[in-house]
């Protein structure tokens, strides 16, 4: 990292501000050759760190733009190197001309992600924080953004630090037992050691579980609206979207294929799917639509089964026919503003895991209760404090740690000596190092010497 890199760090296209960032040993020297103020170019000694300097970016005799310039002296910068920022007016042609001049002065084009790579290599960030920055930039919902923010501010880093500390303490105990077996020292019992390992394993499993739940929410819950024609599926779709997305008609079979649309529910992207009405038909195209409706319904995360309570009479027959589909669904009794006297929600009391809600798409009655039920089904929807987000690479390493600890427990139960099962603890520690890019085996010695009197 002896060279100096530069790149435009704002998004492409025109904007109010365009920023060029430069990092490396020659960043300040190169910068000073373009900073013109009070009829002269500024010398490096005149540029104070962490101070906004208003000046002209000038190439030779040619004034390019009135800019703000910032200098961050190593190691107190994002990359840990000397880092400079030029804040231009955001014209891409202007930025290109300035950047080309910076390259001619000795900097080279930065590679993709190279500023963050240098931050990692200079220990300004660990790998989990680098990955969190990428997630922060690409987040598609408030929920994902909040989870990325937690990782940027060290959520996974703190977890791995705690995990590592516990495993090093465990390893120190085991190594002391091996190396100082002739000393008159008291060690923890096997049961105590098993409990410690189980606790560490449980921490990892909880983390993985929270991440899996978070990933499910980020990847979109699919909520499928299902039922016979004219039960109000398309009307409910429009109500939930807050706009006319599905065609509404009294003619059965209007919706021939499923229609899907994304909404944000408590900051989480949810995919709503309006399906074709299910009925007996000879129309080939409508049959294909109904087949797709069935597939969508079966694969849904949340199933909204709509019925028209203003028309249906024989509810017991309906329950017997639809029981399998009703189980685990939310039954939406629509059109309660024109309720038929035959309707009785208690008829559904023996259907397993069924929520019955009464609504009117026309008057909006019961819609808030439906939204609450959806949130309940998704499990504390939108509360990012209940979740942790792991990248696929991180999850793999934590799952490997769990396997190492499982094997450690197995060896302990089989009566294996510490010399054998300590290797699995070593493997687990190596995996933690892979998570955040830090491995330091010397720390184990420090733990041993601080705990036991060995200096004879």
Swiss-Prot record:
BP term (GO), one: tRNA wobble uridine modification
Positions of (6S)-5-formyl-5,6,7,8-tetrahydrofolate binding: 21, 85, 124, 456
UniProt binding sites for GTP: 230-235, 249-255, 274-277
Residue sites binding K(+) per the record: 230, 249, 251, 254
Keyword Ribonucleoprotein: no
Entries under PROSITE patterns matching the protein: G_TRME
UniProt-annotated binding residues for Mg(2+): 234, 255
Role, per record: Exhibits a very high intrinsic GTPase hydrolysis rate. Involved in the addition of a carboxymethylaminomethyl (cmnm) group at the wobble position (U34) of certain tRNAs, forming tRNA-cmnm(5)s(2)U34.
Protein's name in the database: tRNA modification GTPase MnmE
Organism, scientific name: Leptospira interrogans serogroup Icterohaemorrhagiae serovar Lai (strain 56601)
Gene symbol of the encoding locus: mnmE
């Amino acid at each position: 990292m002896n060279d100096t890199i530069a790149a435009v760090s704002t998004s492409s296209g025109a904007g109010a501000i365009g920023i060029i960032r430069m990092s490396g040993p020659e960043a300040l020297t190169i910068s000073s050759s373009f900073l013109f103020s009070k009829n002269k170019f500024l010398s490096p000694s005149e540029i104070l760190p962490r101070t906004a300097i208003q000046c002209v970016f000038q190439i030779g005799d040619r004034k390019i733009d009135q800019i703000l310039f910032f200098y961050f002296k190593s190691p107190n910068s994002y990359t840990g190197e000397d880092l400079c920022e030029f804040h231009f007016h955001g014209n891409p042609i202007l930025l290109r001309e300035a950047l080309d001049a910076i390259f001619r002065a000795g900097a080279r084009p930065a590679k993709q992600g190279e500023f963050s790579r240098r931050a990692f290599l200079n220990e300004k960030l660990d790998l989990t924080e680098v990955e969190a920055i990428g997630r922060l930039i690409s987040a598609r919902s408030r929920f994902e953004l909040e989870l990325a923010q937690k990782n940027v501010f060290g959520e996974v880093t703190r977890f791995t630090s705690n995990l590592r500390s516990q495993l090093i303490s465990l390893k120190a105990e085991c190594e002391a037992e091996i190396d100082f077996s002739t000393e008159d020292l008291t060690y923890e019992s096997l049961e105590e050691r098993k409990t410690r390992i189980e606790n560490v394993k449980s921490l990892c499993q909880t983390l993985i579980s929270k991440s899996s739940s978070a990933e499910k929410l980020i990847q979109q819950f699919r909520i499928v609206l299902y039922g016979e024609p004219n039960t109000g599926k398309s009307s409910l779709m429009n109500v939930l979207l807050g706009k006319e997305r599905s065609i509404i008609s009294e003619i059965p079979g209007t919706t021939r294929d499923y229609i899907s649309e994304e909404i944000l529910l408590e900051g989480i992207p949810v995919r709503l799917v309006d399906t074709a009405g299910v009925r007996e038909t000879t129309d080939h195209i409508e049959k294909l639509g109904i087949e797709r409706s069935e597939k969508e319904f079966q694969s849904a995360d949340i199933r909204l089964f709509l019925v028209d309570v203003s028309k249906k009479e024989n509810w017991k027959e309906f329950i017997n026919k639809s029981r399998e589909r009703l189980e685990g669904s939310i039954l939406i009794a629509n059109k309660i503003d024109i309720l038929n006297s035959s309707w009785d929600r208690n008829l559904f009391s023996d259907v397993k895991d069924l929520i019955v809600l009464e609504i009117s798409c026309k008057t909006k009655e019961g819609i808030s209760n439906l939204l609450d039920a959806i949130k309940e089904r998704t499990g504390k929807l939108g509360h990012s404090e209940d979740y942790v987000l792991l990248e696929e690479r991180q999850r793999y390493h934590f799952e490997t740690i769990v396997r190492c600890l499982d094997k450690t427990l197995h060896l302990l139960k089989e009566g294996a000596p510490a010399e054998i099962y300590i290797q699995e603890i070593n493997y687990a520690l190596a995996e933690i190092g892979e998570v955040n890019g830090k491995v330091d085996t010397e720390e184990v010695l420090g733990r041993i010497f601080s705990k036991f009197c060995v200096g004879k």
